[in-house]
UniProtKB/Swiss-Prot annotation:
Pathway the protein takes part in: Purine metabolism; AMP biosynthesis via salvage pathway; AMP from ADP: step 1/1
GO cellular component, one term: cytoplasm
Catalyzed chemical reaction(s): AMP + ATP = 2 ADP
Keyword field contains RNA-binding: no
GO biological process: AMP salvage
Chief location bin: cytoplasm
Protein name as it appears in the record: Adenylate kinase
Species of origin: Jannaschia sp. (strain CCS1)
């Protein structure tokens, strides 16, 4: 089973992906994690990624699709796409890739959380990390969140209509206890 978790920054996508990995043995494909791992891998793709990043350039969709292809071909018991796709062009590229490797996209789960709650979550996440002596993400502040939300609404939210038209979109309330959100996602996956 392959799924995409969609939602604005701070919606809890990473938290819920972690639960799915633990409970269902799925593989989380986080583009950020894949790029960092590729950079240090010493592979041909890794050297390409390192060169692009070292020059301060944006990693192209083609490179990201190549990394995802490697993961899909390595196999697994279902994939969670986290941080990809972010645009309609990327959604089309992912659909083409899945078709090429003989896989399907089973569900796109959109996590609903209002902006006010997102601000509270992000501020709280930063406070909890600082209190625990852990590093605070540089973008875990209200000003950065506003910029990230603008980007999300501009570029990523059109994916909601795209996947709705394909009858793959499922809404799950993202507010509430982590376990309640996880149950909502499980209900979608088990339906």
């Amino acid at each position: 089973m392959n799924i995409i978790l969609l939602g604005p920054p701070g919606a809890g996508k990473g938290t819920q992906a972690g639960i799915l990995v633990k409970d269902r043995g799925m593989v989380q494909l986080s583009t950020g994690d894949m790029l960092r791992a590729a950079r240090t891998s010493g592979t041909e793709m890794g050297n390409l990624v390192a060169g692009v990043m070292d020059r301060g350039e944006l990693v192209t969709d083609e490179i990201v699709i190549g990394l995802i292809r490697e993961q899909l071909e390595a196999g697994g018991s279902g994939f969670i796409f986290d941080g990809f796709p972010r645009t309609l062009a990327q959604a089309d590229a992912l659909a083409d890739l899945l078709a090429e490797v003989g896989q399907t996209l089973d569900h796109v789960i959109a996590m609903e959380v209002n902006d006010e709650a997102l601000v509270g979550r992000i501020v709280n996440r930063a406070k909890e990390a600082a209190a625990a002596g852990q590093p605070v993400r540089a973008d875990d502040n209200e000003e950065s969140l506003k910029i990230r939300l603008m980007e999300y609404y501009k570029k990523t939210s059109p994916l909601l209509g795209y996947y709705h038209a394909k009858e793959q979109l499922r809404w799950v309330p993202g507010l509430g206890a982590i376990d309640d959100v996880a149950k909502g996602i499980a209900d979608v996956l088990d339906a």
